[in-house]
Each structure stands twice: as C-alpha cells, then as structure tokens.
Amino acid sequence: MPTLWKLPRHKQSMMSARIHPCMRRRVLHAGDPCATMLTSMSTSLHHRAVEHLGTRIVGGALPTGHVMLAEHLEDELKVSRSVVREAVRVLQSLGLVETIKRVGIRVLPAHRWNPFDPLVIRWRLAGEGRGAQLRSLAELRSAVEPVAAELAAGNAPESLRQELVGISLAMKEAGDAGDMARFLDLDIRFHALVLSGSGNEMFANLIGQVTETLTGRTVHGLMPEHPQKQALQWHMDVAHAIDAGDGSLARDAAAKIMRQTIAELAPSWDDQPRVFVPVSKN
C-alpha cells in the first residue's frame, strides 16, 4: 500500500479517517490509554501469530525442514514484519525453528524442541501425539511429585501446610458437586503448592508443566464427570501428612495419586510409540 504522503489530498483524507486516533499520536506516555490500547493490539497479534505457527509446527502441518519466508507469513497472518519477527523469536527460543540467512525460517526436528515449555506441551496435547505427551508428563510427575510431597512434609512453611489442607477439603466439595471448573483451579493450586513446598526450586519450576497437564486433561475430555472418591481422599491424605510432617505418608499418598492417574490415562497412549532423543557424542 502506498504511503499517505504520496496519495492525492482527497484520498489522504479518506484513509486518514479510517485510522484510529491513537495511531496518529507521535508521543505516548506511560498510563496513556492509547499506549495501553496499542500495546494490547500488538500483544494480541503477536500471541495469535505464535499460536498459529506453533500449533501447525507441533501438529505436523509444517514438517521438519519446511522453510517459511517472513514476507509470506506477513500475508498469511495479515500482520506486520515486526510481529512476524517477534513471533519467530519466540519459536526460536522454544527450539521449533531456526533462521538461515538468504534461505528463510526453517522448521527443526522434534528432538530440538524444548519439551518442558508449557507452550510446547499445550500444542502437543492439542495434536495427534496427545497420548505420548500425556505418558511423558505422567511419568515425569510420578518421579517428582511423591518426592516433592515428602520434602514438603519436612520443609514447607506453616502457612502453606494450612492452605494445602484447606484446598484438599475444597477439592472434595467441588468434586462431589461435579463442579469441574472449580475442581481444576483447586487441583492446579494443590499440586503447585506441593511442588513449591518441597523447597526445591527445580521442582517448583515444573508448576507450569503440571498446570498444562491438568488443564489439558479437562479441555480434551480426559477427566471423569466426577473425580474418583479414592483420589479425593488421597489428596486429603497428602495434605494432612504434609501438615503433620509425615514425609513417608505424604510420599505414599502422592504415589497413589499418580498410579491412579496413569491407570486412567494409559488407554490414550497404548498405540503411541515412545520418543527416543539422540544423545550427542561430546
């Protein structure tokens, strides 16, 4: 599109009338409503571009080795070059693509992706490889959460212990009532507190991954209409054991939760192969 200053005066006026007043402002200050609006617009376009490309790459629509050009993405997504650049930078940080000078933006193989990033997890859960992703996450949680519960029993601050007990009781109420939206929020908070209460920052940094796992189960219809009563009891057992400082009981109850989770989800991955990541010879 030609720039305004090259157009005849009457056409300049017509096009100018279509531009939001904020777009004509040259100076914006912090707190200015226009600054907020424009930032929101930019963030929304950027988010849409990242989601569109990330979903297609992880879902296989854009296979390994596929090359994209920035100008084509501008046309496809109806966004500016700066939005494309920002989106590509995000995808690069996730290991999904690389930029090659005078070639373009190339899709990288799955073993180069960051499997711990919540975005990658969400996109995998939305695709055909959902079962394999659920298996990997369930096995990770099985290895970590019982240990985290045991550590929390010995290290968590009193306020966290009390909140955990309260949440476990609220989870039972929500589960019995079939209020799965509230149950999901409480379940996410429960497991986040267990990981955080361990006092291990590596465990605490898995909260995002666990959140995507629990959310994905609900979004993709992999949760029962009412949580198993035994599972609700095990959550309360974990909370009370942590509150009482009983690490062994906390670990055992958390392990029971994960064994039940695996039993419920196993049919979703029975026919999906495992992923073997190449090991570099350094």
Regions found by a protein language model. Give the residues of each.
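Short linear motifs at protein or domain termini
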Residues: 5-6, 11-14, 18-143, 150, ...
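Short, flexible helix-adjacent loops and helix caps
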Residues: 58, 62, 149, 153-157, ...
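Short loop-to-helix capping motifs
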Residues: 70, 178, 199-201, 245-246
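A generic "binding-loop/recognition-motif" signal
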Residues: 103, 190, 199
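All-alpha effector-binding/dimerization core of bacterial HTH-type transcriptional repressors
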Residues: 112-189, 230-256
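C-terminal all-alpha effector/ligand-binding and dimerization domain
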Residues: 165-168, 172, 189, 205-282
